[in-house]
């Protein structure tokens, strides 16, 4: 029930692999061999605020001191590797950096808000680790990954391809007393970065030169070999073609399931898809044919503006730009109708 998009393993996801291996190894090292050094990685807001120990904002927010949190966050990072493959390592790293920086600010705001509004004194030590960016990744996961029903239980309740990911997130959310503050700050920072609030995505991003340096220095260390199991899929003539076709097939299945769900919701509401937008009525077409040719050309309305974001989403599913533009114009910028139109033609 894990999200399955593209190749299995960590192929073409070096940043996800580094975030999965390095913090987990350091957490084990601090827990088993160096417990006396854990004090340097405690996320102490009181020490940051009153003693100006700014370094704790870095050390206290990288390594998990609780192995249970390290395990759950590692599983979530492994499943969220699909965003590194979709966006690229630089954009994925920029999202993590932006949400990591913003969440530090929201931690202080939430602690002060709880203290002054509810009169509840929050403990100075918040859960340590790279947790806020992990919760921030739930924002694009919820918005951009369609639901595919796997099984149905208890009538309206159903198990989807995203159920286990949400269960892992809930397990991490309930693992400590004050981890909900870190989770809320991560979700808020993820929404701010994903929605481009105050253009934070332009300010908090990885510079090109730095991305090139890390790509040259660290990518060979954390890069994974090409999976050989996919070569058995008899689709294309090469492994790259097979992988691309498999990714396109999975993405199309996801979007087709999403379209079926939207169609069922519209049928339950008593409404059907307005196919008149795709095929005009016969009377209207006759009136158009009776009009004068040059005059109708002068009165022709300009082409419909198409959202570039929706074009990009259709191109990510494997459709060409021309087909995506034509389908979106025919469906009046309805992404679900355009997707169904492209899947059936």
From Swiss-Prot:
Location(s) in or outside the cell: Endoplasmic reticulum membrane
Glycosylation sites: 161
Domain UBA: 305-345
Entry-linked Pfam families: UBA (PF00627)
Function: Restricts trafficking of FAF2 from the endoplasmic reticulum to lipid droplets. In association with LMBR1L and E3 ubiquitin-protein ligase AMFR, negatively regulates the canonical Wnt signaling pathway in the lymphocytes by promoting the ubiquitin-mediated degradation of CTNNB1 and Wnt receptors FZD6 and LRP6.
Region of interest: Disordered: 287-306
InterPro entries, A to Z: Rhomboid-like_sf, UBA, UBA-like_sf, UBA_UBAC2
The gene coding this protein: Ubac2
Membrane topology per record: Multi-pass membrane protein
UniProt keyword RNA-binding present: no
GO cellular component terms given for this protein: endoplasmic reticulum; endoplasmic reticulum membrane
Keywords: Endoplasmic reticulum, Glycoprotein, Membrane, Signal, Transmembrane, Transmembrane helix, Wnt signaling pathway
Assembly: Interacts with LMBR1L, FAF2, AMFR and VCP.
Top-level taxon: Eukaryota
Name of protein: Ubiquitin-associated domain-containing protein 2
């Amino acid at each position: 029930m894990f999200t399955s998009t593209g190749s299995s393993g960590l192929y073409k996801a070096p940043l996800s692999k580094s975030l999965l291996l390095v913090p987990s190894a350091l957490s084990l090292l601090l827990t088993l061999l160096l417990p006396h050094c854990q004090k340097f990685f405690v996320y102490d807001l009181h020490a940051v605020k009153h003693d100006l120990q700014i370094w704790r904002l870095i050390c206290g927010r990288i390594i998990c001191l609780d192995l249970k949190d390290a395990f759950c966050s590692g599983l979530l990072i492994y499943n969220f590797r699909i965003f590194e493959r979709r966006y690229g390592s630089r954009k994925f790293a920029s999202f993590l950096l932006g949400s990591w920086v913003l969440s530090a600010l929201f931690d202080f705001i939430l602690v002060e808000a709880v203290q002054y509004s509810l009169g509840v004194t929050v403990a100075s030590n918040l859960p340590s680790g790279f947790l806020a960016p992990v919760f921030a990744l739930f924002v694009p996961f919820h918005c951009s990954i369609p639901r595919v029903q796997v099984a149905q239980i208890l009538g309206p309740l159903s198990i989807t391809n995203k159920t286990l990911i949400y269960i892992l997130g809930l397990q991490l959310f309930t693992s400590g007393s004050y981890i909900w503050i870190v989770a809320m700050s991560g979700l808020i920072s993820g929404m701010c970065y994903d929605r481009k609030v105050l253009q934070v995505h332009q300010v908090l991003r990885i510079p090109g030169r730095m991305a090139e340096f890390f790509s040259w220095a660290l990518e060979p260390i954390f890069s994974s070999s090409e999976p050989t199991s996919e070569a058995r899929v008899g689709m294309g003539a090469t492994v790259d073609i097979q992988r691309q076709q498999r990714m396109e097939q999975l993405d199309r299945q996801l979007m087709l399931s999403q379209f079926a769900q939207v169609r069922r919701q519209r049928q339950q509401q008593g409404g059907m898809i307005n196919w008149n937008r795709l095929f005009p009525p016969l009377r209207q077409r006759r009136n158009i044919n009776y009009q004068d040719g040059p005059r109708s050309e002068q009165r022709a309305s300009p082409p419909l503006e198409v959202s570039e974001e929706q074009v990009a989403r259709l191109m990510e599913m494997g459709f060409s730009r021309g087909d995506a533009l034509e389908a979106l114009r025919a469906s009046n910028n309805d992404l679900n109708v355009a997707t169904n139109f492209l899947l059936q033609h």
